[in-house]
Amino acid sequence: EDGRGGYAKLASVAKTFKKKTKRNIRSLLIHAGDAYSPSLLSGLDKGKSTVDMLNAVGVDYMVLGNHEWDFGPKITRERVWQSNFTVLASNVVDSEGLPVDGTVRTAMEIVGPFRVGIMGLVTPNVKEVSSPETDQFLPVMDTAKKLAKELKSQGAHLIVAIGHLDFVEDMEIIQSGLVDVLLSGQDHYHIFFDNGKDVWMDAGEDAEKVGVLDVHMKSYMKRGKKRFSWETDMRYVDTKHIKEDTVIASKVKSYEDLLGKELDVKIGETLSELDSRKKTVRTEEAAIGNLIIDAMREGVKAEIGITNGGGIRAKKIYDPGTKISRRDILSELPFGNVVVKLGLTGSQIWEALENGVSQVEQNSGRFPQVSGISFTWNPKAEVGSRVVSVDYKGRPLSKY
């Protein structure tokens, strides 16, 4: 977006730092999850091309994110085994209590005389927002406490958690003091925190800005004992003016050419502006949300329709007169979700809408785009009591 981000620019930034690698300097490229989905191409090949690109870029470590289960646990495992880098999912186990096949619980990096312990933590709400089936997600804090102890017993001087966690879960990790460094994803914020004891960094999304964290470690003698200390420098590399890596750019183009043959087919035209930016579809009624859920409702001949704004993904503004293509449709709706028609009571509809507006402050993807009904809500009210009214066919819909 705006000339920022993408694999080719990420590769250029990564190469700059990896050139500095030697015995006492280790440069690692870390991905905080949500790689396999959603994207235009992953909707067609279930993330295979994404892992191919991550391998080419030179990722060293990745934690699984909630979208890694979008195509089911079998595909999750296929993509993990396809990876040429270490994949962590420290608090995830299968139905038999074993780690997800191909992942590791912890890792240890040796940097000169120092040992850096690494864990990867996944938000437990995967079971609500994706398709993990029988995979289980253990409590984040319990896992962090257990693994921090294990890593220290293995001689770790510094403990790093790569987290694909909600903001509140990130805060709990930092406040606990269990880890020294938290590198997080999921919320897509730019976070830059260092209180002298713990460091927390989040680099947003899509490599628009690449987070760079330099950790300087040293040992010294004090009162006859060997001590260890560390300090950090944090910054972001804005990729807007970064030159693309030519090899990776060529690889990206080959995938884009493949897509173009199938998707650059015009299927319609918009007569009014459509806004699919995240801040719009996740916080308010949006024309594009109305259009999408109207089509879903018409497709199954339902009386009303509700879809979550977080399923609308392209983050674009379509000016009036824009020709709409297959590419646009798949960019906006990459998940391959199924439209379900079912009977609901008035109270169940109210409950669904309450759930939809319960996490607007966190920019959650559950905000309801609706068809066939209208509702008003108060964002300042207590969660669970925010919906003020619901109308169906011009009449109030009973809450009871």
Where are these regions (language model features)?
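Acidic, metal/ion-coordinating pockets
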Residues: 1-244, 254, 281-295, 305, ...
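Feature captures C-terminal
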Residues: 2-9, 84-91, 95-96, 103, ...
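Charged/polar, solvent-exposed surface patches and flexible loops
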Residues: 12, 16-19, 78, 146, ...
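Amphipathic, soluble alpha/beta structural segments
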Residues: 165-168, 235-261, 373-399
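Short acidic (Asp/Glu) and glycine-rich catalytic loops that position anionic groups and cofactors
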Residues: 192, 229-232, 270-276, 328-335
